[in-house]
Design a protein with these regions (language model features):
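Ser/Thr/Asn(+Pro)-rich, low-complexity disordered segments
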Residues: 32-488
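Bacterial N-terminal signal peptides that target proteins for export
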Residues: 2-15
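N-terminal signal peptide c-region/cleavage motif recognized by signal peptidases
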Residues: 26-28
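Bacterial N-terminal signal peptides
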Residues: 13-24
Length: 488
């Protein structure tokens, strides 16, 4: 067996901006589960309960209680991911709802987090700032709270994911106590400080980010992907809103990825995280913008079809990866064993490190690496295929991929090459298994499990006036948007 090491991958926003459009795979029509109300068996429900609790504990145990900063990955030494902080702020509410922690514990952790971001240095320094113009750097040093390195961008989407948790906190902690009043005040001020039009050097689109020296990333958020939430929050701002027409500009590129893949017709984005992140906080069931009215398909239904197509792709398994099947599937941005090019029985194969894996009309990036969050974060969309998949992955691979914090980030049963690994380990008889969890992959698991169980996060966010305003300015109508706000 021969191998050669690949150069490191691009940072993910730049990588996604450079994806080549048009790769596709089509297989014969397969029998697929039909939509309907799925009822988990007692054994399945117990498995999901255990996964939710363990995944919550990852956030609770790894965050710095003084600043609220959540590591990008753990265990091990890591910088903080501001997106992971947003998922964590929301997970604390789930912890209260499920009885994992007390409300007072959640209040204290949330206050510490909001105080840190509210008071953090906002300037154009290369090394001594946490953010600028209300946005925050993608990665922060866990000790100083400043930009983790000069390669780190001021990120519009990661700031948005942080704000998802900030706005959740504003709407969840509604009691008339001094501490919960302060949570609401801090959260509101953090959101109001974001200067969305400044991040539009090529308006009406929003740039992916900025670096000191006035350099905006030369790529904008264009549909369809996780950038959806960026536009909703930018449109909903009471202080620095973007102008009308931005949502229409975002939607203008939809047609390039609308089509049929693996028997499902939907708006494609190959990695499943693009279908999950915005819908972790916003309930898109029954609400539609002009595009979804025209196609008679809401975004929740679109994400359901994306999950179904990935399962069908795994069943077809065109690249003959080990382990793929009806209950072992799921491609998204995750860690991996590479980068290496290895020659073996199936010819030359490329294995990546961290990258955006996926399968769709827009792109196929598949090296045999399965990320449990791809299925787990889709549980609210398609529980009848996700719950059996989570159960089977846990049963088949056991403690190698499942530990005190739930599933490890990823595993690859096709990779057995003995080499120096950047992360993870080789398990005899299984293959490569990661040794850490990532905050941005843990978040969709715990939050979407609770949305599937009780609509909890969705119900809280329906009360947020900025979310409602952003959706309405984007042209969404119907469903819960037409109903009065339900008090907690």
């Amino acid at each position: 067996m021969m191998m050669r090491r690949l150069l490191p991958r691009f940072h993910l926003p730049v990588l996604l901006a450079l994806l080549i459009i048009g790769a596709s795979w089509s297989a014969p029509s397969l029998a697929r589960p039909q939509p309907g109300h799925f009822v988990a068996s007692p054994q399945q429900q117990a498995m999901v309960d255990d996964l939710e609790r363990r995944t919550f504990e990852w956030f609770w145990q790894t965050a710095d209680p003084k600043t609220g900063l959540v590591p990008d990955s753990a265990p091990g030494h890591s910088f903080s991911s501001i997106a992971a902080v947003g998922f964590g702020l929301t997970a604390y509410g789930v912890g209260v709802e499920r009885g994992y922690i007390t409300r007072e514990q959640a209040v204290q952790r949330t206050l510490a987090t909001l105080r840190f971001f509210h008071d953090a240095a906002q300037n154009d320094s290369e090394d001594d700032a946490t953010g600028y113009h209300g946005f925050y750097y993608h990665f922060l040093d866990m000790e100083t709270g400043h930009r983790a390195g000069r390669y780190v961008e001021l990120s519009s989407v990661d700031t948005t994911l942080l704000l998802g948790g900030v706005l959740f906190a504003e709407s969840f902690y509604e009691r008339d106590t001094p501490q919960e009043q302060q949570i609401r005040q801090l959260a509101d001020e953090i959101y109001r400080a974001v200067d969305w039009p400044w991040m539009q050097p090529r308006a009406p689109l929003i740039s992916m980010g900025w670096t000191p020296g006035g350099r905006f990333i030369p790529a904008d958020w264009k549909g369809y992907d996780e950038g959806m939430l960026v536009y909703v929050l930018a449109l909903g701002s009471p202080t620095h809103p973007i102008k009308d027409g931005a949502w229409q500009a975002w939607c203008a590129t939809y047609q390039a990825t609308w089509g049929t893949f693996e028997g499902q017709t939907f708006l494609n984005f190959a990695p499943l995280f693009g279908h999950q992140y915005s819908q972790t906080w916003i309930d898109f069931r029954g609400i539609r913008d002009a595009w979804s009215r025209q196609h008679d398909l809401d975004y929740f239904q679109n994400s359901r079809r994306a999950a179904l197509s990935q399962r069908a792709y795994a069943i077809a398994n065109p690249q003959h990866w080990t382990g793929y099947g009806a209950n072992v599937w799921g491609l998204t941005a995750s860690n991996g064993p590479g980068g290496l090019i290895v020659k073996g029985a199936h010819g030359e194969r490329t294995f990546y490190g961290y990258t955006a894996r996926g399968a769709g009309l827009d792109d196929i990036t598949d090296d045999g690496t399965i990320a449990p969050t791809a299925a787990g974060g889709s549980i609210a969309f398609a529980p009848e295929i996700v719950v059996p998949a989570l159960a089977e992955m846990k049963r088949r691979y056991g403690g190698a991929i499942y530990n005190k914090y739930g599933f490890v980030d990823a595993f690859n049963p096709s990779f057995h090459t003995k080499t120096e690994l950047r992360t993870g380990r080789l398990v005899p008889g299984l293959g490569w298994v990661d040794s850490v969890q990532l905050g941005i992959d843990q978040g969709p698991i715990v939050l979407m499990i609770e949305n599937w169980r009780s609509d909890f996060v969705w119900k809280v966010m329906r009360r947020n006036p900025y979310i409602r305003k952003g959706l309405q300015r984007a042209g969404f109508t119907g469903g819960w948007l037409e109903q009065p706000v339900t008090p907690p």
